[in-house]
């Protein structure tokens, strides 16, 4: 274990960049929230990096608020100061490129709010909903809603991340083809703007702020509460994985499963994975779904393919005791419409909670072998359906030809009409688009540089071939890049930034607008 820790530290030290910045205004420490500010090295160090472990940026202080009002006081002070400083809310720090960091400013430890009781409240009426603090983990929201036999409709694959964190991006998962992203299921928000105002907003009240904050990358306000619609929670899940050796057949079947015709009585969740080379033998070991013999069979299927690439559809059907007798019949009806490789059907029957929290077990496995706290140079893209086969040929069978990635590659479709274009999240012009997640980890020294070069090659391919990709959990180093990303929404982004965060205080780690803090970047 000591050796693994040493290796992890060397990897991190070899790839991080550090931001050195000036101090905070002295009268900040005369505020009533001063007792909640920590400036010691241990506190600032913990808030200096994120899950990606690619970037490090030291804040001057960390705020551990007891109430949202204390966050608002901090933001108001910065906004009214002759020397405004950056403020960044941080939940679990699950960003990959320093988006949750505040170089030269103050990081707000949102999880500190979770120590107060009553931050998750369920209303189980005719139109049920949950009021959840922005700092709450989705796992905690699930636990609270299940006590009432209810649950949110859409889930990210990993539940140990915060409500505000996912809603600031979009929040996608295998249920999004039916219900849209998580932001499409929000009814109301409490937001602290960049001027320190505390605003309750919805589609009908202060709607410009409501739509700006959902998918707004933290640029317009800090979400402290979200009201999220609920549905009756099922008890059990029939969990299915189907293997393919042909990408055209794989995508055709995925698109059938998310179509209106199939989805009315079909899968409740649809995702997919691309397995190539090392991911066939290493990736499945971190999940309890496949047995050793299953993995061997999948590797054998890949060996028969010229490219060495295979594809896996992952789907689920929810059910309760009252519908269990018809489950097998419904599943057989769906499978009869699909063209997966004969004999490559893998099924499990699990509790609803066990399925939703499935990545938790994978996390435990990866932590046990020292592969969780390593750099994650992830790249997530939305690829138009019209170009997904070109993307497959150019990336999986081009850029990644001969590669041996450690991690997971996701690829699954969503329906564009389930996304609200009033919100700031950017999807696709096609009626169907694919979420492609290159969720790879740097296992040894030197991997970060290699993986980053491959990411650059992927982006270059998409640009040169005019694939029309959009980044999800985006990262750009110039405002030109951000303008291209937002496209027609850019003017609205700029106008709303000027309205709700005129001093460009909030979430500087996104690098969309210049930060009020001066920064010097040096290599470690």
Swiss-Prot record:
The lineage of its organism: Eukaryota, Viridiplantae, Streptophyta, Embryophyta, Tracheophyta. PROSITE patterns: FAD_PCMH, OX2_COVAL_FAD. The keyword rRNA processing does not apply. Its cofactor is FAD. Catalyzes the oxidation of cytokinins, a family of N(6)-substituted adenine derivatives that are plant hormones, where the substituent is an isopentenyl group. The modification Pros-8alpha-FAD histidine is found at residue 94. The gene is CKX7. Glycans are attached at residues 42, 121, 277, 320. Transmembrane segments: none annotated. Its EC number is 1.5.99.12. It catalyses: N(6)-dimethylallyladenine + A + H2O = 3-methyl-2-butenal + adenine + AH2. It comes from Oryza sativa subsp. japonica (Rice). Keywords: FAD, Flavoprotein, Glycoprotein, Oxidoreductase, Secreted, Signal. This is Cytokinin dehydrogenase 7. Residues 55-233 form the FAD-binding PCMH-type domain. It comes from the Eukaryota. Its main location: secreted. FAD binds at residues 91, 93, 95, 99, 157, 162, 168, 172, 223, 472, 507, 510. Monomer. One of its GO terms (cellular component) is extracellular region. Residues 1-22 form the signal peptide.
